[in-house]
From Swiss-Prot:
Keywords: Ribonucleoprotein, Ribosomal protein. This is Large ribosomal subunit protein uL30. Belongs to the universal ribosomal protein uL30 family. Part of the 50S ribosomal subunit.
Length: 60
């Protein structure tokens, strides 16, 4: 089983690129301050790297 990491949305997606909004939605984040636990896979890591200026990773 893959390890879990916590991701928190710290900035708004308003006015951001549509691809970046899609990454945030793909991570399961809905609103500022929302934290989700996701599996630590290469695809999830790629989404986090793409929107690193919007999210904060807590489980490293």
């Amino acid at each position: 089983m893959a390890e879990k990491i916590k991701v928190k949305l710290v900035k708004s997606t308003n006015g951001r690129l549509e691809k970046h909004r899609a990454c945030v939605r793909g991570l399961g984040l809905r609103r500022i301050g929302h934290t989700v636990e996701v599996e630590d896979t290469p695809s999830v890591r790629g989404m986090i790297n793409k929107v690193s200026y919007l999210v904060q990773v807590e489980g490293e």
